[in-house]
Swiss-Prot record:
Belongs to the GatZ/KbaZ family. GatZ subfamily. Keywords: Galactitol metabolism. Pathway: Carbohydrate metabolism; D-tagatose 6-phosphate degradation; D-glyceraldehyde 3-phosphate and glycerone phosphate from D-tagatose 6-phosphate: step 2/2. This is D-tagatose-1,6-bisphosphate aldolase subunit GatZ.
Amino acid sequence: MKTLIARHKAGEHIGICSVCSAHPLVIEAALAFDRNSTRKVLIEATSNQVNQFGGYTGMTPADFREFVFAIADKVGFARERIILGGDHLGPNCWQQENADAAMEKSVELVKAYVRAGFSKIHLDASMSCAGDPIPLAPETVAERAAVLCHAAESVATDCQREQLNYVIGTEVPVPGGEASAIQSVHITQVEDAANTLRTHQKAFIARGLAEALTRVIAIVVQPGVEFDHSNIIHYQAQEAQALAQWIEKTKMVYEAHSTDYQTQTAYRELVRDHFAILKVGPALTFALREAIFALAQIEQELIAPENRSRCVAVIEEVMLDEPQYWKKYYRTGFNDSLLDIRYSLSDRIRYYWPHSRIKNSVETMMVNLEGVDIPLGMISQYLPKQFERIQSGELSAIPHQLIMDKIYDVLRAYRYGCAE
């Protein structure tokens, strides 16, 4: 990461896509996509996804590292080319507890990530805990971030410390996605970004972390990009020029969250304007979902009724029976909620792929389709971009390859934006 940031600050047009997903097919796609390049791949886990208690994936940071490495070994991607990051590390998971208890858990969270070899650490203590004012004072956020930084420094080996990088600040909304429709988004003001940096510098120095400050490579800000269930707010470069000019006076770059569904031109403009770390998550699993739904339609027409996986129906049944991951985000009417379950850009389906019923139905569908020849006309109907690549000899009509290539479409846009 340090080399990439240095190259960007030296004037090169270079950035990096941060893959924020724990889905094995998404991680496989991210690694396979860059297997034959010289680029490193940045894969990040969030604090609610992966933590010392397992998170919603059931994985600790060390488990997640081994999970990613196993996929890398399978696809032939060198482990040393993987950068592991921890996103929103702080009290996000424990906001219902008082600050002392939440921060105690947050300290152990950060230590677990660093011990596991994660080298890009987002210190985010912006969340109010039980009894805290809303919002927190910037000074409090910075002081808590300094506590977390001290925790990271205290367990890092000399070798790890050479690789360790920190990201400070946060975007709006808080991690997890928009819970309601958006019409506009508040772009971070320069004075707020400057205050974030100033308060963190003061808090770090007060804790004896002056050296750690040199490892702060990025600030999270809101450049004016966001999405909800069916709306996308696109990057307007002219609106972010004050931010772009301010960061040039520092040794850092910006990290932009929620960049999913922007155009490839927007990604290039974002990197040009020093938003050099572009995070993506739901767009990748949305592409995965699109591919699986397309294959489910093909299965519906090619496979006898008694042998079909009922993949889409199983997904809907599970999500309706177990609504905890989507209920507070989606609309309430039955038809509306069903549309959101299927097609929301927020893609809350991503929380359900590990469910045993859904996992088994997807596996059944894949086995069914691997045993038949899929007519080209059907691929043209349901996966038209993949049809074109089959025609040009770049791709085979194999279900797994079709899913991979669908995810590659998202990664291709980021490559265009980030490539030197």
